[in-house]
A protein has these predicted regions:
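Structural recognition of the beta-strand scaffold that forms the well-ordered cores
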Residues: 2, 21-25, 62-67, 89-91, ...
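Extracellular/luminal Protease-associated
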Residues: 1-88, 155, 256-257
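Soluble metallo-hydrolase cores and metallopeptidase-like ectodomains found primarily
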Residues: 2-14, 79-157, 169-182, 205
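Second-shell loop/turn segments in exported
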Residues: 1-3, 35-53, 85-90, 116-118, ...
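Loop/turn elements at helix/coil->beta-strand transitions in domains of secreted/extracellular proteins
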Residues: 17-22, 59-64, 108-109, 138-142, ...
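Sec-exported extracytoplasmic/periplasmic mature domains
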Residues: 57-62, 66-69, 101-105, 172-179, ...
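His/Asp/Glu-rich mid-to-C-terminal helical/loop segments that flank catalytic regions of hydrolases
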Residues: 89, 172, 176, 183-186, ...
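Metal-dependent peptidase/peptidase-like ectodomains
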Residues: 87, 97-98, 104, 137-139, ...
Length: 330
């Protein structure tokens, strides 16, 4: 049973779905992605991986397949997290989803699924945290961050080794330039973003008494392609405060700030929900979702010059937030 979206599934009689394997054939919006809105394109596609199995099981399906959430290329299926459901669920490459859809249009298709994925027992992991102490207000904190874990298929170079390196290099650039911001710059490599964001939750729990002193949180978790600027969950007043920073970022074309209604990145989401201004580096995303969550997420996908641009982008914003006279208005 092939459907393109949830509305098509819900429009079907239950008896037509019962006992079938449902394929969600939602096509990733390549044109939206190459226009600088790769994250939005991914968000439209990934809901079927995240929630498709639950929706199909409620209609009596015995299994689900989802067209991989990302740009189709090289017949690579993309892995990722899915909501718990009482039926098997798997991802297929974009090319194979198209093949199944074409065959289904011609008649009955029989599929045999052999799924070997499993979730092992929980183990102990750790966030990695380092502080560059503020010169005047060390109790006030600006976070720069990426996440340490990755899916098992690739090496995690773009998701999110690049983000960790960019955050580390932010502190290193300030040290090398002998800059001493007024507030503490805190570098965090978050643990377990991919499965449940438990590193984020542990940090907020451990620092619950200090959340009010968090001036801002930045994360890089969209690879290391050319930065366009930032997606930001901040007030309009805070956006005006950042106008001088945008002037500096314009030097290498990274001066856009797009306000968003919710946290731009997973690991800083809880802080954002508690009122901490949250920013995520906005890259052009031309190829990120081609390799994301696949065996092709390897170091050769990183362009050194673009990685340096991302480090400069985070360093400029991180230093500005840590050193400005008044913190961002919440």
């Amino acid at each position: 049973m092939v459907v393109n979206n949830f509305d098509e599934l819900k429009a079907l009689p239950r008896e037509q779905v019962a006992g079938k394997i449902v394929l969600y054939n939602e096509i990733y919006d390549h044109h939206k992605a190459i226009s600088g809105q790769a994250g939005a394109a991914y968000g439209e596609a990934v809901v079927y991986r995240a929630s498709g199995a639950v929706a199909a099981s409620q209609m009596g399906a015995v299994g689900t397949l989802v067209r991989s959430a990302g740009d189709g290329a090289y017949r690579l299926p993309h892995t990722g997290w899915s909501s718990d459901a009482p039926i098997p669920a798997g991802a297929v490459s974009a090319e194979d989803a198209g093949l199944i859809a074409r065959l289904a249009a011609q008649g009955k298709v029989r599929i045999h699924l052999t799924l070997t994925t499993h979730r092992g027992p929980d183990t102990t992991g750790y966030n990695v945290v380092a502080d560059l102490k503020g010169s005047e207000h060390p109790e006030q904190v600006v976070i720069v961050s990426g996440h340490l874990d990755s899916w098992d298929l690739g090496t995690g170079a773009i998701d999110d080794g690049a983000g960790v390196v960019v955050a580390m290099e932010t502190a290193e650039l300030l040290r090398r330039l002998n800059l001493h911001p007024k507030r503490t710059l805190r570098v965090i490599a978050w643990m377990n973003e991919e499965m449940s964001a438990s590193g984020r939750d542990a940090y907020v729990k451990d620092h619950s008494a200090e959340v009010a002193n968090h001036v801002a949180a930045i994360e890089s978790d969209l690879g290391a392609e050319h930065p366009l600027g930032f997606h930001a969950k901040i007030s309009e007043a805070a956006q005006k405060q950042l106008t001088p920073v945008q002037t500096v970022l314009a030097w290498f074309g990274a001066n856009l700030i797009q306000l968003v209604p919710s946290s731009p990145e997973t690991d800083i989401e809880t802080l954002a929900d508690k009122g901490v201004p949250a920013l995520g580096i906005w890259q052009n995303g031309l190829t990120y979702f081609t390799y994301h969550h696949t065996p092709a997420d390897t170091l050769d996908k990183i362009v050194p010059q673009e990685l340096r641009e991302n480090a400069a982008c985070m360093a400029v914003m991180g230093y500005a937030l840590a050193d400005m006279t008044e913190p961002l208005q919440k």
